[in-house]
Amino acid sequence: MPFIVNTDADRESMLHATGVSSFDELIVDIPREVRLNKALELAPAADEMEVRSILESMAAANRSTADYVSFLGGGAYDHFLPSAIKAIVSRSEFYTAYTPYQAEVSQGTLQAIYEYQSLICRLYGMDVTNASMYDGATALAEAVLMAIGVNGRQKVVVAGKLHPWNSSVLKTYLEASDHSAVVQNVVEDGVGSIEVLKGLMDDTVAAVVVQQPNFYGCLEDVEAIGRLAHEHGALFIVSANPVSLGVLEAPGAYGADISVGEGQPLGSSQSFGGPYLGIFSVRQELVRKLPGRLVGMTKDSNGQDGFILTLQTREQHIRREKATSNICSNQALNALQAAVYLSLLGKQGLSEVAGQSLSRAHYLAGRIAAIPGFSIRYNAPFFNEFVVDTPIPPSEVVRKMLEKKVFAGCDLGEFGDEGLLVAVTEKRTKAQLDMFADALGELA
């Protein structure tokens, strides 16, 4: 960043432009008790070698999956990332999160986004996918806002166990509405109760939301939930783990109107929580209500294929009240990572990743269930994640496993729940699974 001077003359000019005579007058609305009335006391300037040493010592305090065996999940997963992903997305032509507005000089980036959209449509079994959303949580919230805008209804029913953070983001998005309400279905044995859900449905429901697999890792009865939604004229919104679709049926196959998801498992590292990728797909009839950006294929004046931004119904292009969303910059770089990941693996490769994650998770669950004092809480089918009841507080399990360089899983106490949420990916070897089970056995 270039150094820009701030001279006395510059400051006088700025104060004059704002109509005040002094800096104190400019900040008069800031209470005096919260103002800094002394020097910042910054550390002395350091040269490059000193700065590198300081930062390396700070980074050494981190605990990462490079050094620890990870069973963390809950929305962010430790999948293997081929080296080619970073090599491709780090190219200067791609290395930006911003949308290419000038189509005539951005055909490569636009085509890459178009390929991402096409791959996600195939994976989720949907007709149209946008260029990306911020993350899975905001994609879900935008899907609900879209449903309310489509049918004009106000009630939203969450059919099963949704990630608590996704629920929080959804409620935040709906706070500005005077009428919208979120109703949570009863969860029994890890999944939403279909019988209770029937009683929640009426002609005021705008959308029925389900996460598949759900927050506990269990598989919801999505076909029954979808039928109930459509019987009452509501839109059916599915938030699906994209890797799970290597072995599970695509949302479009069981009637989803809108499919969203957290795209982190598709080529993005866990990265201490972000940036991630929001997947957003719809059926064709809803395309004009689709939030975010959409890349389409067209013909130029010479009859050659070209790529453009199409259906740009965002607020900076039309009146705010008519806009489909207010998303600005997007996650194009993460979308590119997802496209590269899916292209490298192919259909069979993704199925193998999903299949290995599933089989290894079930092997570990069997090992843990055999340990005295430990049990698998739910009997419902699961993909690669499950809840374990422990003989000692889960927080203690997590702490003791750190001593063995193992991330034991997510302590559900952080979400006002109980138990340990354990996730397994294709990266976990049988030796690591056995080591973890044996270490848990020492705690029994």
Curated annotation (Swiss-Prot):
Catalytic activity: N(6)-[(R)-lipoyl]-L-lysyl-[glycine-cleavage complex H protein] + glycine + H(+) = N(6)-[(R)-S(8)-aminomethyldihydrolipoyl]-L-lysyl-[glycine-cleavage complex H protein] + CO2
Protein name stated in the entry: Probable glycine dehydrogenase (decarboxylating) subunit 1
The organism's taxonomic lineage, starting at the top: Bacteria, Pseudomonadati, Chlorobiota, Chlorobiia, Chlorobiales
Organism of origin: Chlorobium luteolum (strain DSM 273 / BCRC 81028 / 2530)
Matching InterPro entries: GcvPA (IPR023010), GDC-P_N (IPR049315), GDC_P (IPR020581), PyrdxlP-dep_Trfase (IPR015424), PyrdxlP-dep_Trfase_major (IPR015421), PyrdxlP-dep_Trfase_small (IPR015422)
Record-level Gene Ontology MF annotations: glycine dehydrogenase (decarboxylating) activity
Quaternary context: The glycine cleavage system is composed of four proteins: P, T, L and H. In this organism, the P 'protein' is a heterodimer of two subunits.
UniProt KW Oxidoreductase keyword: yes
Keywords: Oxidoreductase
Its EC number(s): 1.4.4.2
